């Protein structure tokens, strides 16, 4: 069996203020590769995750087995979801309920009594309670339909204690956040070796070693641990299982890498997600480690060749403000000369860079006032006539923020070429371009883009024009890029990535 230990620390957020964003995780990427190849795997969950079943559904993850530290401590052994509504709580007889779009506010005699917060699927995440307008406690609900944890707060609205419950409402463990000490309910003394622990990590480690991985077969099983500096469990506790530590740019790992490197006695198995991580590992440990990309290719060719207008995608997430403005200005100079032939979509991940994209467009309008109009700002009939009479070009320039993998697929479907001029290559963007079959213009050399084959390396922003000229309006070069990308798709397919995993798993 393949056991994976992900670094999943965060709980689900209050969606009333959470801005949708795309997230990447090395464990999820490994899991997708296993699932694509129908290779069984188990998850070892070390963090408190009351909404785990919801998370797995959102990620379309179906492990063969889930070994969960807090499920063991709380006596839960199933994944059956159960809906809990606000009516299931015991409210004072004179409670009034104020329903809003995102939560329910409970009032008693005109005073705030409680506030119920929901997730994106309408399930209750938690209930906050108040006394004299002061936040006193929070009840977190498990997606399987029970109160899982109670959080107590001081007068400064800081959490002081976590109390964990089972499905029957009995408390199992109490965690003092100021001292990190843990008390185990004597009613469940057979669950653990001790009733008191100085550190929560000691209890969690005991559960993993004595109850979750106690049947680990060193000859046939494999343990893949995401190395992460935020984990509550010291990574050296896994060394007895001869693990493969997965390191990626998505999780800080330098501190724990130093710890396990000192304790492993030169018998450390590490895995990097890209060349950059490989170089950092080699610099810190001196080890040459294998690389398995996190993102697999998918044969999903775009349809830009069916469009008369060639759309340029400019990805600015990793560019500075000045670089983004320069690149947009450069592409504008192309569009204004042939507005019917080319278009521009500025792409970002974050809300901050989306604002930069809008600023770039506004700067164009300010610097070139009267020289063009945006196609998105549809003029009325009179303005349309005046535009045609004065030959003011209508330019197709827009900005799009990518928040899901599906969204990037929709955006790339109509792109003719993509520019990623950040200091480092964005691997997800890159593998999507390869899967879509479109060329890429990059700032740095990398193993996926071969100069003047499926892209052009552009050391300076002014070089971008040369790369655009090479592929746009030239079907021969574009088709050559497509053929090269199809070959790369085979190299980065789920089957090929699984072959790399099988090589690592051979003992």
What is the predicted role of each segment?
Residues 385-429:
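Donor nucleotide-activated moiety binding/catalytic core segment of transferases
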Residues 294-381:
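Conserved catalytic-core segment of nucleotide-activated headgroup transferases in glycan assembly
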Residues 414, 418-479:
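Catalytic binding pocket for nucleotide-activated donors in carbohydrate/polymer assembly enzymes
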Residues 491-507:
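C-terminal alpha-helical cap of glycosyltransferases
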Residues 211-217, 238-242, 247-270:
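Membrane-proximal helix-turn-helix segments that form the acceptor-binding/catalytic region
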Residues 477-491:
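A short, well-ordered alpha-helix in the C-terminal region of glycosyltransferases
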Residues 1-218:
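Long terminal accessory regions outside catalytic cores
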Residues 263-289:
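A short, active-site helix/loop in glycosyltransferases that binds the activated sugar's phosphate group
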């Amino acid at each position: 069996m393949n056991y994976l230990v992900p670094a999943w620390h965060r709980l689900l957020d209050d969606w009333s203020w959470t801005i949708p964003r795309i997230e990447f995780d090395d464990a999820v990427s490994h899991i997708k590769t296993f699932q694509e190849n129908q290779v069984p795997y188990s998850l070892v969950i070390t963090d408190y995750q009351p909404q785990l079943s919801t998370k797995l559904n959102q990620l379309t993850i179906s492990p063969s087995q889930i070994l969960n530290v807090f499920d063991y401590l709380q006596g839960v052994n199933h994944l059956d979801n159960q809906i809990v509504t606000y009516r299931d709580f015991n409210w004072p007889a004179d409670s009034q309920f104020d329903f809003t779009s995102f939560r329910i506010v409970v009032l008693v005699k005109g005073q705030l009594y409680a506030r119920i917060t929901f997730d994106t699927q309408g399930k209750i995440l938690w209930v906050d309670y108040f006394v004299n307008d002061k936040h006193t406690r929070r009840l977190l609900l498990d997606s399987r339909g029970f109160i899982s944890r109670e959080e107590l707060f001081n007068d400064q609205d800081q959490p002081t204690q976590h109390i964990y419950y089972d499905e029957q409402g009995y408390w199992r463990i109490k965690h003092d956040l100021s001292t990190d000490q843990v008390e185990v309910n004597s009613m469940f003394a057979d669950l653990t070796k001790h009733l008191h622990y100085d550190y929560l990590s000691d209890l969690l480690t005991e559960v993993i070693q004595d109850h979750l991985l106690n049947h680990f077969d060193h000859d046939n099983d494999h343990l893949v641990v995401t190395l992460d500096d935020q984990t509550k469990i010291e990574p050296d506790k896994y060394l007895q299982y001869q693990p493969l530590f997965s390191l990626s740019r998505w999780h800080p790992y330098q501190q724990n890498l130093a710890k396990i490197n000192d304790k492993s006695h030169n018998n450390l198995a590490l895995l990097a997600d890209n060349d950059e991580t490989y170089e950092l590992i080699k610099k810190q440990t001196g080890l040459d480690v294998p690389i398995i990309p996190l993102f697999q290719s998918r044969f999903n060719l775009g349809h830009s060749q069916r469009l008369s207008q060639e759309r340029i995608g400019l990805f600015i997430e990793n560019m500075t403000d000045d670089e983004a403005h320069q690149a947009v200005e450069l592409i504008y100079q192309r569009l204004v000369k042939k507005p019917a032939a080319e278009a521009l979509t500025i792409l970002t991940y974050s809300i901050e860079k989306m604002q930069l994209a809008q600023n770039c467009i506004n700067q164009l309008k300010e610097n070139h006032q009267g020289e063009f109009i945006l196609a998105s700002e549809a003029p009325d009939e009179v303005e349309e006539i005046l535009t045609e009479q004065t030959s003011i070009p209508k330019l197709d320039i827009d900005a799009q923020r990518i928040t899901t993998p599906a969204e990037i697929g929709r955006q790339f479907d109509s792109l003719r070429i993509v520019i990623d001029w950040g200091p480092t290559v964005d691997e997800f963007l890159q593998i999507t371009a390869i899967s879509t079959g479109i060329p890429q213009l990059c700032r740095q050399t990398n193993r996926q883009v071969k100069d003047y084959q499926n892209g052009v390396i552009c050391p300076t922003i002014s070089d971008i024009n040369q790369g655009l000229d090479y592929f746009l309006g030239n079907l021969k070069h574009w088709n050559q890029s497509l053929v090269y990308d199809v070959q790369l798709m085979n190299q980065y397919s789920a089957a090929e990535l699984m072959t790399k995993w099988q090589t690592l798993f051979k003992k």
